[in-house]
A protein has these predicted regions:
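Short beta-strand
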Residues: 228-232
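Right-hand nucleic-acid polymerase module
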Residues: 1-85, 93-150, 155-204, 209, ...
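Short acidic donor-binding/metal-coordinating loop in glycosyltransferase active sites
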Residues: 152, 233-234
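Short beta-strand->loop micro-motif that forms the acidic, two-metal-ion catalytic signature
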Residues: 234-241
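Conserved recognition-core residues within compact binding domains
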Residues: 89
Length: 365
């Protein structure tokens, strides 16, 4: 059983509880002290469980249809759309819930968040205050020299109803709530309305939160394989100061995944060093251990703004918004270099990139 409740720790210290509820594993990161069930915890846990039970009951009162919708009813509330990827001819499939179902899902997320369960420290996607850049900073702080990037195959689609339920039963407070008949039914109803055709879809508001939640036990185990491990959704990055044993690490990962639907996408597995190409979540660490965009991204960005400044009128509002977001993101990574490039091409075309990106546009659709 895993416990990651911030509210039951001293804010100046982090605790790990090695024995709680029949000596099952209870996890809290960056441990400095240990307690047993006989000491500090039992008075607080029941109060928190009662609070969680009340929150679930309030959710069913707010949305009585939660327990009435069948799997078929839920599936009918989705619309499937395909978004073109960067690779020509490839698409990302999104399953978008109706406004009615989406409202229920938003309230479900609020209810689950009120339980106070934290995501693992290694998870950086869909977590407020964490980003891809923050994930790479962890590897940078370790002065890592070797990197192993692993991609999970069909991550959201691998999260089936049974897998979600099985994972929740390992995490506090769900491990106890699922033992109580009324609460167990509500949790199963929540899983039901979170899924489309029996799996977590990309495109609804509950999937990102649930994936991080159910990955807590797995992230905990993966975190022990190499000195540094981070996960950004389906992208896992392992690093060390010495060369990583590729076969051994992959075998260990597959052993952790055994009995789960999770699979490694072997086509995207990459091992690299700081002296060569490293592909760390789209960013890189150079020889000086600085986070950089990498040569290829810089080359494409220069070509893009050069073309845009040459004839900005031919760009659609969607393309302008996309370029604006990309520029802001790149500025956060390498502000000095990106500012230099922008000024260079501003002078070349006698225009102002940032003004053009942020000026109000009107289009006829």
């Amino acid at each position: 059983m895993f416990i990651t409740l911030q509210k039951y720790t001293n804010p100046t210290k982090q605790y790990s509880f090695d024995t709680l509820f029949n000596n099952e594993l209870v996890f809290k990161e960056n441990a400095t002290k240990q307690y047993t069930i006989e000491t500090n915890i039992p008075k607080k846990i029941p109060n928190h469980l009662f609070f969680c039970m009340q929150q679930l009951e309030n959710l069913t009162k707010q949305h009585p249809e939660l327990g009435l919708l069948t799997t078929e009813d839920v599936d009918k509330e989705y619309t499937t759309v395909r978004i073109p990827k960067k690779q020509k001819g490839k698409y990302r499939t999104l399953n978008i819930p109706s406004d009615k179902l989406k409202n229920i899902q938003y309230d479900v997320v609020k209810t689950l968040q009120s339980f106070g369960t934290l995501t693992h420290n290694s998870a950086f996607a869909y977590v407020k205050g964490r980003s891809i850049y923050n994930a790479l900073e962890v590897h940078q702080q370790n002065n890592s020299k070797w990197f192993l990037k692993i991609d999970l195959k069909d991550f959201f689609g691998s999260c089936t109803k049974n897998f979600i339920y099985k994972q929740l039963k390992q995490i506090y407070p769900y491990c106890i709530l699922t033992q109580k008949e009324g609460c167990d039914k509500i949790i199963k109803d929540i899983i039901k309305i979170a899924c489309y055709k029996g799996k977590l879809p990309q495109g609804n508001p509950i999937s990102p939160y649930l994936t991080n939640l159910i990955m807590v036990p797995i992230d905990y185990k993966l975190n022990q394989l190499t000195p540094v491990y981070t996960r950004y959704s389906d992208d896992m990055l392992f690093s060390a100061r010495t060369k990583i044993d590729l076969n051994k690490t992959i075998n260990n990962i597959e052993a952790i995944f055994k009995g789960t639907p999770l699979k490694i996408n072997s086509e995207k597995t990459r091992l690299g060093s700081i002296n060569g190409n490293n592909w760390n979540l789209g960013l890189m660490l150079n020889k000086d251990n600085n986070i950089t965009l990498g040569h290829e991204k810089k080359r494409k960005f220069k070509a893009t703004i050069d073309q845009f400044l040459y004839n900005p009128d031919k760009y659609s509002i969607h393309e302008i918004q996309k370029l604006s977001g990309l520029t802001s993101y790149y500025m956060n990574i390498e502000p000095k270099y990106i500012s230099y490039i922008i000024n260079k091409y501003n002078k070349k075309h006698n225009k102002n990139l940032l003004e053009l990106l942020h000026k109000p546009y009107s289009f006829n659709f």
